[in-house]
């Protein structure tokens, strides 16, 4: 078995958890490698482990989904929507992993095409202003003009991303198993501008109809700029993210705890 481990060393206890995992792997003949930005595109693994928070998991979304590699995301901080809470039972968790005593939870992701480059987002693709000026963005659904937004930007989110930036911008909460696309304007200059919830077969195009450039941000990471009349095209990907679950998790219990924070 080949295991890749991606660690956010800024998180409390991340080094301690890594040491425990590596010790168990070494004792059981498991090949492992620390994954970083330099080697994650060239190395293939049977499974991936992330140690950190939900944000740490986002670093391996593209690799894991394209290669159908299951991911065990171990939480080191506050309660996460996506990560596993193992607490002090890290040894038990890893032995259950080795014995394959787990199940797979699949999450839909968005595939975004920007100038012939393709990016993958577990949470969202954001088209946002580059300056303090508001921007004009045109939304097309399956090639049909739907609406023009004067706003600070637009969030194109998955069901998983409905509890992230989209929620802060006033978007709805959607059960993560649903293969829908959410379109949420950011601070729109119109009381009639509302979020849209679209089916999984829809293709969305967001065109920059402003006189200045806008930024494209994928899962919190800047990837490119759109000049006037350039666009980003988004759809639900044929690839899913496979999350390893060691125990049953109730979405609404997690949601209740997160909202209380």
Curated annotation (Swiss-Prot):
UniProt: NAD(+) binding residues: 54-55, 123-124, 150, 152, 163-168
Domain of life: Bacteria
MF terms in GO: ATP binding; metal ion binding; NAD binding; NAD+ kinase activity
Cellular component aspect of the GO annotation: cytoplasm
SUPFAM superfamilies for the chain: NAD kinase/diacylglycerol kinase-like
Keywords: ATP-binding, Cytoplasm, Kinase, NAD, NADP, Nucleotide-binding, Transferase
EC category: transferase
Known cofactor(s): a divalent metal cation
Cellular compartment(s): Cytoplasm
GO BP annotations listed: NAD metabolic process; NADP biosynthetic process
UniProt EC number: 2.7.1.23
InterPro entries assigned to the protein according to its UniProt record, in alphabetical order: ATP-NAD_kinase_N (IPR017438), ATP-NAD_kinase_PpnK-typ_C (IPR017437), NAD/diacylglycerol_kinase_sf (IPR016064), NADK (IPR002504)
Active site residues of this protein: 54 (proton acceptor)
Catalysed reactions, semicolon-separated: NAD(+) + ATP = ADP + NADP(+) + H(+)
Signal peptide: none
HAMAP family: NAD_kinase
Family stated for the protein in its record: Belongs to the NAD kinase family.
Biological role: Involved in the regulation of the intracellular balance of NAD and NADP, and is a key enzyme in the biosynthesis of NADP. Catalyzes specifically the phosphorylation on 2'-hydroxyl of the adenosine moiety of NAD to yield NADP.
The protein, known as: NAD kinase
Organism expressing this protein natively: Caldicellulosiruptor bescii (strain ATCC BAA-1888 / DSM 6725 / KCTC 15123 / Z-1320) (Anaerocellum thermophilum)
Protein's gene: nadK
């Amino acid at each position: 078995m080949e295991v890749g481990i991606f660690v956010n060393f800024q998180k409390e206890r991340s080094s301690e958890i890594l040491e425990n995992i590596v010790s168990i792997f070494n004792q059981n003949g498991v090949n492992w490698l620390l994954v970083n930005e330099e080697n994650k595109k060239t190395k293939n693994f049977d499974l991936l482990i992330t140690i950190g928070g939900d944000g740490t998991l986002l670093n391996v979304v593209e690799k894991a989904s394209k290669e159908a590699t299951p991911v065990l995301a171990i939480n080191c901080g506050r309660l996460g929507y996506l990560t596993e809470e193992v607490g002090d039972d890290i040894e038990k968790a890893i032995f259950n992993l080795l014995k394959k005593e787990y199940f797979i939870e699949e999450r839909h992701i968005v595939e975004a095409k920007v100038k012939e480059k393709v990016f993958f987002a577990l949470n969202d693709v954001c088209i946002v202003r580059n300056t303090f000026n508001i921007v004009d963005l045109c939304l097309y659904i399956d090639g049909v003009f739907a609406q023009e937004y004067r706003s600070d930007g637009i969030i194109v989110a998955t069901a998983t991303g409905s509890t992230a930036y989209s929620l802060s911008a006033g978007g709805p909460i959607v059960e993560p198993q649903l293969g829908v696309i959410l379109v949420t304007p950011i601070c729109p200059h119109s009381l009639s501008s509302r979020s849209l919830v679209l089916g999984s077969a829809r293709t969305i195009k967001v065109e920059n109809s402003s006189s200045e450039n806008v930024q494209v941000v994928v899962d919190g990471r800047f990837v490119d700029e759109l000049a006037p009349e350039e666009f980003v095209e988004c759809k639900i990907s044929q690839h899913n993210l496979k999350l390893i679950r060691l125990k049953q998790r109730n979405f609404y219990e997690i949601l209740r705890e997160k909202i209380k924070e």
